[in-house]
């Protein structure tokens, strides 16, 4: 019930999700559920790669493991049930975490995730604990840049989110 669970994402998150408003509720929910399935498969493939699987093995196994994960693990079943963005945020963070430390774009995907929904910002600790300073700085810089750009374009919505909605426990 959308009245029970209000939308409290930063303006950038609203922008990213706004194309779903082009569809009726049922179609938008189905699109989100399909996206969650794809994102879960990507997450599984990235985990497989980080465990040393070949890309072929990772992508051959990922869809089947993703189905199992979505059916058995509560965070995934809840994401599907509510058509939430949690798996997208996890996929963005996993792209950075699983990338080689030498990749210069490492941190961008996590920074975008943190600009969409604040929770993924905790992923900066992964880079800090690994002493991957460039990735941590890239993540923070990406998130701040996107958030500040959002503020410039949507100052009223940004102020409402950061000074009101973000602090409202309901």
Which ranges hold each PLM region?
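Membrane-interface alpha helices of multi-pass inner-membrane proteins
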Residues: 104-128
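Primarily membrane-embedded glycan-assembly and transfer machineries that use lipid-linked glycans
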Residues: 1-106, 130-170
């Amino acid at each position: 019930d959308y009245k029970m669970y209000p939308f409290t994402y930063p303006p950038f998150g609203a922008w990213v999700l706004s194309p779903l408003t082009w569809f009726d509720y049922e179609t938008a929910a189905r699109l989100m559920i399909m996206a969650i399935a794809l994102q879960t498969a990507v997450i599984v493939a990235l985990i497989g790669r980080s465990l040393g699987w070949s890309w072929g093995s990772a992508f051959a196994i990922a869809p089947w493991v993703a189905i199992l994960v979505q059916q058995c693990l509560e965070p995934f079943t809840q994401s599907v049930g509510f058509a939430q963005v949690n798996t997208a945020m996890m996929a963005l963070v996993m792209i950075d975490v699983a990338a080689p430390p030498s990749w210069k774009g490492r941190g961008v995907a996590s920074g975008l995730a943190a600009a969409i929904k604040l929770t993924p910002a905790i992923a900066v600790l992964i880079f800090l604990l690994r002493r991957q300073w460039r990735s941590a700085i890239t993540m923070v810089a990406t998130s701040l840049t996107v958030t500040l750009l959002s503020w410039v374009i949507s100052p009223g919505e940004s102020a409402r989110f950061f000074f009101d909605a973000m602090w409202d426990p309901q």
